[in-house]
Amino acid sequence: MEIYDDRGLQWAATHATAGRRSEAASFAARVPPDATRIDLGCGAGRYLPYLGRPAIAFDASSVMLDACRAAFPDALYVQGDVERLPFTRGSVGGAWSWMTHLHVARDRLPMALWDLHRVLAVGAPFEVQVLEGEYEGDALDGDEVGGRFFAGWRPDRLGDVVAGAGFAVEDGSLSVSGDEVRLRAVRSRTLADTVGEGMRMLVCGVNPSLYSADAGGGYARPGNRFWPAALQAGIVGKDRDPADALCAHGMGMTDFVKRATRTAAEVTVDEYRYGFDRVERLVRWLQPGAVCFVGLSGWRTVVGPRAVAGLQPEEIGGRPAYVMPSTSGLNARTSLEELTGHLRRAWEVGGGG
C-alpha cells in the first residue's frame, strides 16, 4: 500500500473521470432500498457518487481514503484488506469492485470471493471488472504508478471462479472491452468454494443443503458425520471450519452442483454434468493432490454407474479421484469408523499423512 500512499493521489488526479458512470448507476438501482453497498478499492472516490447511499468506501490506503472523505463526507469509511473484509455475515447489500480484485493473485481470488460471499446478503448484486489476459506480476507494461501487482483473467475462468464462489453470473454480462473483462452477478443462497493453491485434497460434495447454505459451511447439520470423521482422521483441526481446513491443513471444499436444495434428490442430470465440467476445470487449474467425492450419486451419474467406493480408475483434471459414501445421518449403513477410513485413505492418496 506504500505505492498508493506515495503516488496514488497523483494517479487519481489523472483518472478522475468515471468512465463507467452508467454501469455504476445501474448497479445502484439493483441494490435494495436502504441496503448498504460497498465500493471495494474506492481510491479517491471516482465512482462513489454514483453508487447510491448508504455506502461504505473501502480501501487499503489511508491516503486515498482521506482524499475520498474530503470529497464525499456522507459515506462510511473503512480501511482494510479486500481479502479479509471486516464485516459481519450478510451485512452488506451490494458490492462494486472496479479494477480492484485485479490486484489479488489468481490462486487467492477464490478465497477473497469466499469472504465477499460471506458478508453479502442473499440476492445482493456484485459487479467486478479486472484485467483481461494471462499476465500476473508486478512489472506490467503501461502501469502508470509502477510496481503494482496485477493478475489478468480469461473471461471463462473468471466466470468459473465467481460461480464457484457462490454467485449466479447474469446471462450476457460476462464481456470483454479492450484489456478489461467484467461481469454482473448476484449472491446466491449457496456455499462458496474454499479452494487455493497447494491443496492436499479437494473434497467435493453433491450439492449444499439449504441448512448448510444458511450456516455458511458444508455438512453443517448436527447429524452429518463429515466433520467428526475428518477430525477423527486427523485431516482437519477445527470442527465445521472450512477456511481453517484449507489454510491450516490443505483441505479444500467444493460441490458438484452449486444450487442448494432440501435434498440431493432434487439435483438434475444436466446439473450434475455441468457441475462435473466446472469441477474438472477447477482441478485442472489448481491441481490438488487428490479429489474426494463425498456421496456416490454424482460420480455414478456422470462417470460410471457401477462405481464403488474407493480410488477410481478414472482421474479428474489429471488428478486421482476417490469416491466415498455419503456422510449424511440418513446413510445408516455406513459407520463413522468406515467414513473416517475413507477420508484417511483419500488423504493419503493426495499425499497427506
Where is each model-derived feature located?
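Short, glycine-/aromatic-enriched active-site segment of Class I SAM-dependent methyltransferases
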Residues: L131-F149
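Class I SAM-dependent methyltransferase SAM/SAH-binding core
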Residues: I38, G43-R84
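A conserved beta-strand element that flanks and buttresses the S-adenosyl-L-methionine
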Residues: W96-S97
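Short, surface-exposed acidic-centric catalytic microdomains
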Residues: A215-D270
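Conserved class I S-adenosyl-L-methionine
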Residues: M1-P33, E134
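Conserved beta-strand signature within the Rossmann-like core of class I S-adenosyl-L-methionine
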Residues: G123-V130
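C-terminal capping/extension of enzyme domains
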Residues: R187-E197, P222, A229, T263-F276, ...
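A short glycine-rich, Lys/Arg-flanked "PGG" loop and its adjoining helix->strand segment in the class I
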Residues: P110-V122
